[in-house]
Amino acid sequence: TARLIKQHNPDARVVFIGPCAAKKLEAMRRSVRSEVDFVLTFEEMTGIFSAKHVDLENIDEDPAGVSDASTDGRNFAVAGGVAQAVVNVIKRDHPDHEVKVANAEGLKECRQLLKLATLGKYPGYLLEGMACPGGCVAGAGTMQAIKKSQTAVGLYAKKANHQFSSETEYIKELDKLVD
């Protein structure tokens, strides 16, 4: 997304805001550096809001475009969410196709899953690994308990108007840029 934004609007400033402190290192990679200008964690955003006396309780919940996010997209931050989104699209397009999934949470489990996959223990499986146990909602820059975040994400995902990201206006606009 950042690459497309920069291609079509080179003067745009792209800011990633999320719970993942590792995104800061990722944004410094040579392949990404010119596309993402800033990375802020939720913890940093809380500090900014506090310093600027921003009262989040009195801000409209739905800035333009946010409500168009899909159920699958909203669930990305929870362990198993990315793989489930892929499975949902495969099942939609190929209902008779079996999809085998293996998930890992935390670096130790991720290493173990990759080791087993390298040894051929998961042929044909879709593998998902989340560095933080519980998923991105448990990242170093999170501000609340993991279970509370997972529940909040689940409730937010259920409110989506679309199941699949391909149904959202935002993705339709991105598709036009790619074509």
What function would you assign to each model-found segment?
Residues 1-179:
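Iron-sulfur-associated redox domains of electron-transfer enzymes in respiratory
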